[in-house]
Amino acid sequence: MDRLPPPPPPPRQPLPRAQVLAEKAFSALEHFLHIEAVSGIVLLAAAGIALLWANSPASHSYHALWHTPLSFGIGSHLVSQSLHFWINDALMTIFFLVVGMEIRREIHEGALANVRLSALPMAAALGGVIVPALIYLAINTEMPQRQGWAVPTATDIAFAVGVLALLGKSIPGNVRVFLLALAIIDDIVAVLIIAVAFSGGLDYGGFLVAGTGILMVLGLQWIGVGTAYAYVVPGAILWLGMLKTGAHPTLAGVVLGMMTPVLPGRTRERPLDVAMRALLDLRARATARTPKPEHIAAPLKQLRHAQRELLPPVIRVQMALHPWVAYLVMPLFALANAGVSIDGVDLTSGGSLGAMFGVVLALVVGKPLGIVSVSWLAVRLGWCQLPPDVTWRGVCLVGLLAGIGFTMSIFIATLAFEDVNLLGAAKLGVLLASAIAATIGLTWGFIYARGRRPSMERADESTAAASD
């Protein structure tokens, strides 16, 4: 007996115009927020607002806001700190968590997974750390301004990649990969500097608390717990332990990021098979025009679970946190730290002018000089070679963009200087240097892209001729 053909699908009802417009608006917004240059623009806007606010007649409200006490407690245990502390020491832990996961991914499958691939960005990053530090120390020979030697060693990934994105597809993809690898190695060095140079006297009792948090994370991973929410409490314990030790608590984020698995969890059944079965089940149950929720709830739950298990945890968590870091954590950090009162910075006393000038010169000149010169030396000695489609002009572009220190440089400045005047001068230097480096980098990028167009056109013509 022949089987009857399946019934035709019910006719689709036209959506209300308001719903169509809303869906288009949200789709455009989602696409807009995933453009790399946008996060840099938001960060720049936050810094601009902070700078204007701190130099306006309402400047007292700016400083009063960040010194507002905020308390968290459980039972008799109470932690009370300023809003500035919670942003710099707690919220920035999420930023460092993403940094740790980026490092973990690069070590597993990226530019740091292969010694030959990582040799050039490692050499470039080494030059981009040592030369700026030496330039700063050459200008600032006395204490306490010498303590700011690490301020110009960092690179702001979001800003640098955002400026590069403004240049469009005319820049080879390998230039972007080179910049990302260099910036990630810069982050590793910055984390080591924070851990070694800017952690106070260690309280070893705190290591027991931090160790408890790490053991809890390992235990959850061992039994196969995949949901990220389960790791919030162990992460908080690790953060409290790092705070108690005297090390900077944001290092807890790096530790957690480096511990995030890079492979999908072990399951009894392949997630793809589960997803296919759930889709077939969903199609079989959803025959009515408006299927009952209880009929489709189970296959939808299976599909959602399979979708989650298909991605490695390091990618899944990074994708979930990226918009929060790009559009909340980093702009809040910029808003809380970029507000330098220009009238309040006395550049005539206490070496403040030297600190500011040292930061500017080290970032704008030292960064590209160190990156290009050490890269050239490493290639000349045969230790590594330039990636495909990357010329020395491209290396110069990377060096110029690496001079955008911004977020990480300001963060290190807040750790390096206790003197308010020196801290203000260093922050002002970072802001000036980042603006100058971005402007020069963008200008050089347009020149570099224009010079590549004739060769790209010749390559397209030769490809077309070969196909004919």
From Swiss-Prot:
Annotated membrane topology: Multi-pass membrane protein
Gene3D superfamilies: Na+/H+ antiporter like domain
Pfam families listed in its UniProt record: Na_H_antiport_1 (PF06965)
Keyword terms: Antiport, Cell inner membrane, Cell membrane, Ion transport, Membrane, Sodium, Sodium transport, Transmembrane, Transmembrane helix, Transport
Source domain of life: Bacteria
Protein known as: Na(+)/H(+) antiporter NhaA
Organism: Cupriavidus necator (strain ATCC 17699 / DSM 428 / KCTC 22496 / NCIMB 10442 / H16 / Stanier 337) (Ralstonia eutropha)
Cellular component GO terms, alphabetical: plasma membrane
Reaction(s) catalysed (UniProt annotation): Na(+)(in) + 2 H(+)(out) = Na(+)(out) + 2 H(+)(in)
Chief location bin: membrane
Gene field: nhaA
